[in-house]
Design a protein with these regions (language model features):
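Tandem CBS (Cystathionine beta-synthase) repeat/Bateman regulatory domains
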Residues: 1-181
C-alpha cells in the first residue's frame, strides 16, 4: 500500500504572506493540529504550522516567522510503512505529500494511519502494549496560564485534570487551550 492510497487530497493550507491569526483560525475551524503553508496563489509548500508553534511564540503575528520552514515530506508513491517510520523517527504528526516541484498533493497524518491502516489490521494485540504509561496531571483549579506552561514544559499535548481527591475530573488538550486564544 502506498501513501497515495491513504492520503487526504483536499488539504487545508495556510498561505504566506499571511498572519498567524489566519492560520490559527483555520486550525480551530477545521479541528486540525497543524497545516501545511503554501505560497499564496500556488501549491508550492513553504512550511508547516502546528499548535506547538503557536505556544512557542504566541505574540508573533507573521506566519512566515512562526512556521517551521524545514519540512519533512513524502511522495505519493512512498510505501505506507516507510511513511510510518518517517513519522515515528521524526516525532511528527503530519507528512505533506509533494510532487517533484515541491507542490502539495496531499497529506498523511497519524490519524489517517489509525483510521485507514491500523483499524483494518487483523490482530488481537492489546492496547497495554502500546499505551503511554506516564502522564502529566494538574489540579482542576490550576490557573489556565500555569497549565499552559506545564503543558509546554512537559511536552504534553494533553493534561489529565484531577479533583481534590485525585480522581480523574477531565482532560485538557492543546486544542482546548487554542480555543481560549
Amino acid at each position: 500500500m502506498n501513501v497515495k492510497d491513504i492520503m487526504t487530497e483536499e488539504v487545508i493550507c495556510a498561505e504566506v504572506p499571511g498572519s498567524s491569526d489566519q492560520a490559527l483560525n483555520l486550525i480551530i475551524t477545521h479541528n486540525v493540529t497543524g497545516l501545511p503553508v503554501i505560497k499564496k496563489g500556488t501549491k508550492e509548500l513553504m512550511g508547516i504550522i502546528s499548535k506547538t508553534d503557536f505556544s512557542r511564540n504566541p505574540s508573533e503575528g507573521q506566519l512566515a516567522l512562526l512556521m517551521t520552514k524545514s519540512v519533512i515530506t513524502t511522495t505519493a508513491d512512498t510505501d505506507v510503512k516507510d511513511a510510518v517510520k518517517t513519522l515515528l523517527v521524526a516525532g511528527i504528526k503530519r507528512l505533506p505529500v509533494v510532487d517533484g516541484e515541491n507542490n502539495i498533493m496531499g497529506i498523511v497524518t497519524s490519524e489517517d494511519l489509525v483510521w485507514k491502516v491500523v483499524s483494518k489490521l487483523d490482530t488481537d494485540e492489546k492496547v497495554t502494549s502500546y499505551m503511554m504509561k506516564s502522564f502529566t496531571a494538574v489540579w482542576k483549579d490550576t490557573p489556565l496560564k500555569v497549565a499552559s506552561e506545564i503543558m509546554r514544559l512537559s511536552g504534553s499535548r494533553a493534561l489529565l485534570v484531577l479533583d481534590s481527591n485525585a480522581k480523574l475530573y477531565g482532560v485538557l488538550t492543546d486544542t482546548d487551550m487554542l480555543r481560549v486564544a
